[in-house]
Amino acid sequence: MHGGLGRRFGSIGLTVSELDAQVWAAPAAVLQLEGLAAERVAPIARRLLAATADNRGLHVITHALPPAHVGLGSGTQLALAIAAAGAGALGLARSPRELAALMGRGERSGIGIAAFEDGGFIVDGGRGPTTTTPPVLARLSFPPAWRCLLLFDERAQGLSGAPERAAFDSLPTMPAARAGRLARTVLVGLLPAVAESDFRAFSAHLAQI
């Protein structure tokens, strides 16, 4: 989205299975970490404890993680998995969107949050002046007969953290005509193709994006 109607960004995304963040948590006297990527888990768990003003600690075991910085939204999935497991262990009732706001996720795309809530092919509405987390505009079941091939370049990783924010901040404003064309392609191209299981049309419209 180009911002002319008061909203920026806007995303499309598809959830995938078998590349999960699997986390276990229980109350503890202090923060205890086991398993994978403790250097990534620690600040997330500390942020949860600080945000909820809970004086207890957490025992967190990270069993599995999706690949990082390759476009799978692993940072959001890890943050929400730890936050959900930790909040549940501490008896704190928080929705995924409340946890996302506490964890500072969804600054641009809402796909990772929506994917944590449920599966499917997802379109979010970007950010407006008062947006906390981008709203889901559409969620469709992806045709089960369709297959997706994921290719990872192990020679390099994408940006994250401050470099990623700087890269987004440096992007020029998208021309209104291009933003309109992309929105139209999603609304009357991609979404109907998914709804009608029209793989040829879906592929053609996706190639336009």
List where the protein language model places each region.
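ATP-dependent small-molecule kinase catalytic core of the GHMP/sugar-kinase superfamily
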Residues: G4-S11, S95-I209
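Short, basic/glycine-rich phosphate-binding loops at helix/coil junctions
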Residues: A29, I82, H205-I209
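Amphipathic, positively biased hydrophobic alpha-helical segments used for protein targeting
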Residues: I82-G86, L90, V123, T130-T131
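ATP-binding N-lobe of GHMP and related small-molecule kinases
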Residues: M1-S74, A84-P96, E107
